[in-house]
């Protein structure tokens, strides 16, 4: 532990997104005077439009809320640690089956209100375009939480310190007006008719001819060209639908358009493909086209997506778009405490570190705030073990690999179970093991949970036969 970091009294945080807000609150509540810089509304990135803090730009879904999934497990850990993002998400959630989706405007408003009400935080709405900005000079620590859309000036300044930067594309799915959906074709329901999810999703069934026509149109559609200085590096979890389609004609049917578990009520048979629509808000006045992130030109989006059965008259509330995401090669440029190896006074948090996703970004900012708050108390906070969702995510940022890529929370980041178990038992076992390790870590690290820790019951694997665990599911 460095002596200078035991006397933190002031902090400057660049970026009031999910990670920045999480970190700011942790530090302010530990007695640190925090200046939180947010460039909106004076300047907006290509993907942002809401002046509120904590804006969600890619989707209104925070993905699965089931603790038998990597991201669901991470959410539970964050709830127990008192995450403001999870507080806001739970307060503004909209029906989405097993997923945690939110009303994005109410969500951002909730976070903004909490930040503005915190006496230890001064919110400055202006852009910080360089690490040499005079406003940063007096801060004991500087946190860059500018997100994947960090401004060009700040990105260049950071690149000068770390010796370079990496980037990839993130694509946004179109949103359509609910009243423009043809409900004589589109039907509501969940995969396998799971209870509690009825009506959370709308489903557009496709027969083989309809799918083939859509597929050919998608491949032929005109795309927004990349800028000369940008090389396309897609993250698998948010790949443009047209890029996915280029892998082969059946890729979509086995991926986002898989029809398994659905029956078309018009025919009584399983469709060849299913395209799902997910509610954007509580009133269900708008739906996003699930899995259809795209970089097609706007006119082409309208032409191609209106070929989907039931969407012939679709009114586009927001077109899909593509923006550049910026992140560092974390294992090379970051120390274990998320400080820059080249400048221990500067820390990174959120997606710019190489975590991927809303929840993961928030978790990263929350963790950094916890680490620095502990140092103020004169102690080092031990990292959760890699068997936990948070620990596994942090381990990803520390593990050198030849081609570092962003990752979301998934069981594949964790140590293998080392057991021969049936496939359906793997996720519950990963989850149960994670809960045991996390609760033990809370006690050993002296961290008091905000809510009672949840301990699931692991499946009985006595005498279980099945394939050995080789690759964990997310």
UniProtKB/Swiss-Prot annotation:
GO terms for molecular function: flavin adenine dinucleotide binding; tRNA (uracil(54)-C5)-methyltransferase activity, 5,10-methylenetetrahydrofolate-dependent. It is an enzyme of class 2 (transferase). FAD binds at residues 15-20. The keyword tRNA processing applies. GO terms for biological process: tRNA methylation; tRNA wobble uridine modification. Residues 453-474 are annotated as: Disordered. Pfam families: GIDA (PF01134). Keywords: Cytoplasm, FAD, Flavoprotein, Methyltransferase, NAD, NADP, Transferase, tRNA processing. The keyword Cell cycle does not apply. It is found in: Cytoplasm. It comes from the Bacteria. GO terms for cellular component: cytosol. Its EC number is 2.1.1.74. Its cofactor is FAD. NCBIfam families: gid_trmFO (TIGR00137), PRK05335.1 (NF003739). Catalyzes the folate-dependent formation of 5-methyl-uridine at position 54 (M-5-U54) in all tRNAs. Belongs to the MnmG family. TrmFO subfamily. This is Methylenetetrahydrofolate--tRNA-(uracil-5-)-methyltransferase TrmFO. It comes from Nitratidesulfovibrio vulgaris (strain ATCC 29579 / DSM 644 / CCUG 34227 / NCIMB 8303 / VKM B-1760 / Hildenborough) (Desulfovibrio vulgaris). The gene is trmFO.
């Amino acid at each position: 532990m460095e002596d200078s970091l035991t006397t933190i009294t002031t902090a400057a945080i660049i970026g009031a997104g999910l990670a920045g807000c999480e970190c700011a609150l942790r530090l302010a509540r530990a007695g640190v005077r925090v200046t939180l810089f947010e460039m909106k509304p004076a300047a907006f990135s290509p993907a942002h439009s809401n002046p509120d803090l904590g804006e969600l730009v890619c989707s209104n879904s925070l993905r699965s809320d089931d603790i038998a999934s990597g991201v669901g497990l991470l959410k539970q850990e964050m709830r127990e640690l008192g995450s403001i993002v999870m507080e806001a998400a739970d307060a503004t959630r909209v029906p989405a089956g097993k997923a945690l989706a939110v009303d994005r405007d109410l969500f951002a408003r909730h976070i903004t209100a909490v930040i503005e009400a915190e006496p230890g935080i001064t919110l400055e709405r202006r852009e910080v375009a360089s690490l040499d900005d005079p406003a940063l000079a007096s801060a004991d620590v500087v946190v860059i939480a500018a997100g994947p859309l960090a401004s060009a000036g700040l990105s260049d300044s950071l690149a000068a310190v770390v010796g370079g930067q990496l980037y990839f594309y993130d694509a946004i799915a179109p949103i359509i007006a609910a009243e423009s959906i043809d409900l004589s074709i589109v039907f509501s329901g969940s995969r396998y008719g799971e209870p509690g999810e009825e009506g959370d999703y709308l489903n557009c069934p496709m027969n083989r001819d309809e799918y083939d026509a859509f597929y050919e149109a998608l491949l032929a559609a005109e795309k927004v060209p990349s800028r000369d200085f940008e090389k396309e590096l897609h993250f698998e979890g948010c790949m443009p639908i047209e890029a996915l389609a280029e892998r082969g004609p059946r890729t979509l049917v086995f991926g986002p358009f898989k029809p398994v578990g659905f029956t078309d009520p018009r025919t009584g048979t399983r469709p060849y493909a299913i395209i799902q629509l997910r509610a954007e808000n509580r009133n269900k006045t708008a739906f996003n086209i699930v899995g259809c992130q795209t970089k097609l030109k706007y006119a082409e989006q309208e032409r191609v997506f209106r070929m989907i059965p039931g969407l012939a008259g679709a009114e586009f509330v927001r077109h899909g778009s593509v923006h550049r995401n910026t992140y560092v090669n974390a294992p090379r440029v970051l120390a274990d405490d998320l400080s820059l190896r080249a400048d221990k006074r500067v820390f990174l948090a959120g997606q710019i570190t190489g975590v991927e996703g809303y929840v993961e970004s928030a978790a990263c900012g929350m963790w950094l705030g916890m680490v620095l708050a502990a140092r103020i108390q004169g102690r080092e906070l031990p990292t959760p073990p890699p068997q936990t969702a948070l620990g596994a995510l942090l381990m990803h940022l520390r593990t050198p690999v030849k081609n570092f890529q962003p990752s979301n929370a998934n069981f594949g980041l964790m140590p293998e179970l080392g057991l021969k178990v049936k496939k359906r038992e793997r996720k519950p076992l990963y989850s149960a093991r994670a809960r045991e390790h996390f609760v033990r870590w809370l006690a050993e690290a002296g961290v008091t949970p905000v809510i009672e820790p949840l301990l699931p019951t692991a499946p009985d694997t006595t005498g279980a036969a099945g394939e050995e665990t080789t690759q964990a599911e997310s």
